[in-house]
C-alpha cells in the first residue's frame, strides 16, 4: 500500500469572496446548507460531475453551497462534509461548470469551501483539522 501524503496548510484569512476572472471584481460570498429543491439544476446533464442529490441523502453528511450575497440563487460550488470525532472530512467538493477550466468565470470557489470546512472543524474544537482524499480521476480545473 502506498504511503499517504500529508499536507500541512494554515488558512490565514477567510476572505468570503470570489473574483470575476474578466473584470477582477470581488463578490462577497455566503456558504449555507443546500436544499434538495435547489439541486434541481445541479445534474450531470448540466455539466456537474457528481450526484449531489445522492450525497444530500446521506444522513451523516452536510452539503453546503457557495453563492454570492447579491445573487443567492446561483450556486458557484458545493461541498459535502462529514463530521468526524477529531476532524471534518471533505467527502466531495466541486466547482459549478462555469467555474472550471481556462474559461472559468470566477476563481476562489474551492478555497472558500475548504476554508469553510476548516472553520467548521475549528468551531467543533478540532483546531481546523480537515481530511480529503482526492478522487482517482482528477477533473481538469
Q: Language-model segments: what does each one mean?
A:
Residues 108:
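An anionic, turn-rich surface loop/hairpin at beta-sheet edges
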Residues 139-141:
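Short, electropositive alpha-helical surface patch
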Residues 1-104, 112, 116-131, 137:
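Non-catalytic substrate-recognition and accessory regions of acyl/acetyltransferase enzymes
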Amino acid at each position: 500500500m502506498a504511503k499517504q501524503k500529508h499536507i500541512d496548510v494554515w488558512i490565514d484569512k477567510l476572505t468570503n469572496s470570489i473574483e470575476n476572472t474578466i473584470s477582477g471584481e470581488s463578490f462577497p460570498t455566503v456558504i449555507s446548507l443546500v436544499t434538495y429543491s435547489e439541486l434541481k439544476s445541479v445534474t450531470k446533464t448540466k455539466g456537474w460531475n457528481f450526484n449531489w442529490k445522492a450525497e444530500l441523502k446521506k444522513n451523516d453528511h452536510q452539503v453546503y453551497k457557495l453563492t454570492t450575497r447579491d445573487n443567492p440563487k446561483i450556486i458557484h460550488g458545493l461541498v459535502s462534509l462529514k463530521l468526524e470525532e477529531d476532524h471534518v472530512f471533505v467527502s466531495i467538493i466541486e466547482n459549478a461548470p462555469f467555474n472550471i477550466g481556462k474559461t472559468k468565470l470566477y476563481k476562489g470557489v474551492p478555497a472558500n469551501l475548504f476554508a469553510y470546512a476548516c472553520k467548521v472543524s475549528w468551531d467543533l474544537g478540532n483546531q481546523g483539522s480537515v481530511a480529503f482524499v482526492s478522487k482517482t480521476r482528477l477533473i481538469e480545473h
